[in-house]
Amino acid sequence: MFNLFKKKQIPSINHQHKNLLISLPLNWKYEFEEGDQEACFDPKSQSTLRLNVIKVTPPEGKTPEENIKDLTVNQPYVTTSKGYLLTKPAYRESLEDGNNITLVTWKLINYDGDEKTIAVLSYTVLSEEKDSEQEKEIFNLLENSLQNSELLN
């Protein structure tokens, strides 16, 4: 017997932006923006995910713990299934073009080697829509995708 109440998963594909390989919704569109950043969005929604990948070299003389604190900006983090550091989402409310928006930001950090790769993902959603069923599904997909994403060399 099948479950009539089982939620249908959002169809997704693997998407690569620079060194970041992440699973995102199949129907999303992609645009490059200024500063080597990429915007990803559902054409039927006003929400946007921005991807930015940077490489940094921590200063010499700091302990690994101090470097992690600097890279995560002292945010709580977890270690993903691939061994990367993933900061917990940081929320910021703002006003943009007369609309209340919520900006949710994650950092995915490859801590191996001398040069560290950091993927910064920022999801912008209208504050009035952030608790909608659709946005909750997208948010869960992003969280799960980040847990399984890769930062390629």
Where are these regions (language model features)?
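Surface-exposed amphipathic alpha-helical segments
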Residues: 28, 120-153
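Glycine-rich, often proline-containing surface loops adjacent to acidic residues and nearby aromatics
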Residues: 47-50, 87-88, 117-123
